[in-house]
């Protein structure tokens, strides 16, 4: 994601570069913000009978947002508050921006605190990890997962039904050839930055004939192998970036040294005001439910150089964080 911050005008100019960037834009755009950009809408000049689709530069005051992870789309709705000179009859009418990868938009935040918090979110997005197509395979099944900074999404299963009869070697090759074909189909669809093969070492030796990618030997393949890949220290950098490691440390401190942990908005806000936060974990849905309160916390954490992790609600960590009040922090002292 490319972005530029104009602090004097409280404006962020952003060009999303891939679908994951749309998620971070969804988080930092609030109701009441002004979003500007090039768009196409129906325009009927005075004195004409029929309208036509015209490209124009508009600004809308945000009333609603709609983000679809699986479609990779972000829509922003609201009344038009700014329009380029020479375009009449559009201001005040409602419009929907489709924010897509490769198209720049401007976001004008309502106050300085929200702008500073938005910078923290953008810094997190800038350090986003490669998108990984994980192929977890053993001699019984293969599971395919899409691993990004947004979490782990299991895409597809393939069972080795041919194991029921026939020659073992040829049947395994038949199954692995099907794994290779499925991998290529998913590679074309999702365009990952890399493919990672995970599973028992002896199986990986065979899989490599059909699928090209980084090999990660582990004890299990299939769906169990997906969870093993995420839980074990096989991809520590990835785990750290999306908050797994911070959440594990938070749970450990809750059990052994609870004074080093703050949970819930009130306690976390107090810790943020005192500059005590080392790592902040915030539920994505909690941001949309309480934007002013959460942006204030994120802004203070960002100023004190805290690590910030935004956690999706539809993950294992998200369920635990929701039970803690939607926000939690590991404290420096």
Swiss-Prot record:
Principal localisation: cytoplasm
Superkingdom of the organism of origin: Archaea
Keyword DNA damage assigned: no
Cross-referenced SUPFAM superfamilies: Dom34/Pelota N-terminal domain-like, L30e-like, Translational machinery components
Cellular localization per UniProt: Cytoplasm
Endpoints of the signal sequence: none
Keywords recorded for this protein, A-Z: Cytoplasm, Endonuclease, Hydrolase, Metal-binding, Nuclease
SMART domains, alphabetized: eRF1_1
Gene Ontology CC: cytoplasm
Record GO biological process: nonfunctional rRNA decay; nuclear-transcribed mRNA catabolic process, no-go decay; nuclear-transcribed mRNA catabolic process, non-stop decay; ribosome disassembly; RNA surveillance
Cofactor(s) listed in the protein's UniProt record: a divalent metal cation
EC number in record: 3.1.-.-
Alphabetized Pfam families for the sequence: eRF1_1 (PF03463), eRF1_3 (PF03465)
Keyword Secreted applies: no
Gene Ontology terms, MF aspect: endonuclease activity; metal ion binding
Subunit record text: Monomer.
Domain remarks: The N-terminal domain has the RNA-binding Sm fold. It harbors the endoribonuclease activity.
Protein family per UniProt: Belongs to the eukaryotic release factor 1 family. Pelota subfamily.
Role of this protein: May function in recognizing stalled ribosomes, interact with stem-loop structures in stalled mRNA molecules, and effect endonucleolytic cleavage of the mRNA. May play a role in the release non-functional ribosomes and degradation of damaged mRNAs. Has endoribonuclease activity.
Protein name: Protein pelota homolog
Gene, per the UniProt record: pelA
């Amino acid at each position: 994601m490319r972005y530029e911050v104009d602090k004097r005008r409280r404006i962020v100019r952003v060009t999303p570069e891939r679908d994951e960037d749309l998620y971070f834009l969804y988080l930092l755009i609030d109701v009441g913000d002004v979003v500007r950009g090039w768009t196409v809408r129906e325009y009927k000049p005075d004195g004409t009978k029929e309208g036509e689709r015209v490209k124009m530069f508009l600004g809308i005051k945000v009333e609603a947002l709609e983000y679809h992870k699986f479609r990779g789309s972000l829509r922003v709705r609201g009344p038009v508050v700014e329009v380029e000179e020479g375009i009449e009859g559009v201001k005040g009418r409602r419009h929907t921006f489709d924010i897509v990868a490769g198209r720049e938009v401007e976001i004008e935040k309502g106050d300085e605190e929200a702008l500073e918090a938005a910078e923290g979110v953008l810094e997190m997005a800038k350090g986003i990890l490669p998108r990984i197509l994980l192929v977890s395979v053993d001699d019984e099944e293969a599971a395919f997962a899409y691993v990004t900074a947004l979490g782990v999404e299991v895409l597809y299963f393939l069972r080795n039904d041919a194991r029921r009869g026939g020659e073992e070697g040829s049947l395994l090759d038949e199954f692995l050839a099907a794994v290779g074909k499925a991998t290529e189909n998913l590679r074309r669809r999702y365009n990952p930055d890399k493919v990672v093969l995970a599973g028992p070492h002896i199986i990986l030796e065979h899989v490599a004939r059909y699928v090209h990618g980084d090999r990660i030997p582990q004890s299990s393949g299939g769906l169990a192998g997906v969870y093993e890949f995420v839980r074990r220290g096989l991809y520590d950098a990835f785990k750290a970036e999306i908050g797994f490691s911070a959440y594990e440390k938070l749970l450990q401190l809750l059990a052994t040294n609870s004074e080093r942990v703050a949970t819930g908005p009130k306690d976390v806000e107090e810790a943020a005001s005192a500059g005590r936060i080392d790592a902040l974990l915030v539920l994505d849905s909690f941001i949309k439910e309480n934007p002013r309160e959460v942006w204030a916390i994120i802004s203070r954490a960002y100023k004190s150089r805290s690590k910030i992790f935004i956690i999706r609600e539809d993950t294992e960590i998200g369920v635990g964080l929701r039970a803690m009040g939607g926000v939690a922090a590991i404290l420096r002292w």
